[in-house]
């Protein structure tokens, strides 16, 4: 067993019936050990041609109702999710030799929730949400710089930058979560939670 692990998966299999409890414990430890961005995750989506796409985003909230990230809804990822809301996430914490995979369906967060998070962002991030037509082709960097200047001039009051309609959050409503723990000689430990009729079923998987 990985010596860095303070929660053996066999123990969790016996004692933890809710995957969010185990996620919380691992996430707390990742915040202590990861050099930066312990909330970084690989987000998997399917585009309109049926091809998978993966990119890194940041987890901004989570709970029994799902895992939340924010983005431009007109971006490639936003359009993919609108077309096919079946998505996945993967956290990989090298410092802990642990990984968590999450599968579920995306739904838009409420406007109130999006507004509250948007207000917590820096002034530059809020004006940047207006300035960047995410995933579109740029003629050159100066085109983006001019757009940033335009919206900073438009919204000079740092406390009064409205949230764009095209910028909001998605919540992954999870129905599968798998916890992976590095083991010697590639004999890893894997514990999977599967939601069935609002209850969680636990299974151990072969490495």
What is each residue range found by the language model?
Residues 1-207:
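Binding-site signature for planar aromatic cofactors or substrates
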């Amino acid at each position: 067993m990985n010596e860095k692990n303070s929660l053996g998966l066999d123990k969790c299999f016996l004692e933890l019936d809710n995957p969010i409890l185990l996620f919380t414990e691992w996430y707390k430890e990742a915040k202590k050990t990861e050099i930066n961005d312990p909330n970084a995750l690989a987000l998997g989506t399917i585009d309109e041609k049926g091809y998978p796409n993966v990119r890194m985003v940041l987890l901004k909230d989570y709970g029994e109702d799902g895992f939340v990230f924010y983005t431009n809804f007109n971006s490639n990822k936003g359009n993919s999710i609108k077309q096919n809301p079946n998505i996945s996430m993967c956290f990989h914490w090298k410092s802990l030799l642990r990984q968590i995979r999450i599968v579920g369906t995306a739904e838009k967060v409420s406007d109130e929730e999006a507004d509250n998070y948007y207000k917590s962002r820096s002034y530059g991030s809020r004006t940047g949400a207006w300035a960047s037509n995410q995933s579109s082709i740029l003629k050159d960097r100066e085109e983006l710089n001019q757009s940033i200047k335009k919206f900073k001039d438009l919204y000079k009051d740092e406390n009064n930058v409205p949230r764009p309609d095209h910028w909001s959050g998605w919540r992954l409503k999870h129905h599968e979560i798998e916890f992976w723990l590095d083991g010697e000689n590639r004999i890893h430990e894997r514990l999977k939670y599967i939601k069935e009729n609002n209850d969680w079923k636990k299974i151990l998987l072969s490495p």
